[in-house]
Amino acid sequence: VYKCDLSNQEILDEYMNCDIVSFPSLYEGFGMPIIEGQAVGRVVFTSDLEPMKEIAGDAALLVDPYSIESIRNGVMKLIKNHHYRDDLIKRGLENIERFKLPVIVKCYMDLYTKLEREN
């Protein structure tokens, strides 16, 4: 179902009403649905392409977005293997920690400090 112009609350509601966040994108600048889904405790499957692999870390099932079979097998694995799904959800909740504002700010401050020392 395609929906547009959703409020932040409506977006959150959509995530909360799903079981699996399906994001087999061919190209993205960042891949917000990955961390949005992980942040609300949903299992995510996404493309085995950058930047999705970097954003997802080891906390999402990666599939070949050009292969219907890979996507189908990924979905079936998430449906049938409860332990694997629960493990990905746990790792997803851990993964989102690196995208929280204080962590990002610290990374930038460390970079600026390093650059200042080098000059």
PLM regions: where:
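Conserved acidic donor-binding segment of nucleotide-sugar-dependent glycosyltransferases
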Residues: 46, 61-68, 77-82
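Short acidic/histidine- and often glycine-rich active-site loop of Leloir-type glycosyltransferases
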Residues: 34, 49-62
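Aromatic "clamp/platform" in nucleotide-sugar-dependent glycosyltransferases that forms part
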Residues: 26
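Active-site donor-binding acidic/aromatic loop of nucleotide-activated sugar
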Residues: 1-7, 14, 61-62
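C-terminal alpha-helical cap of glycosyltransferases
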Residues: 77, 101-119
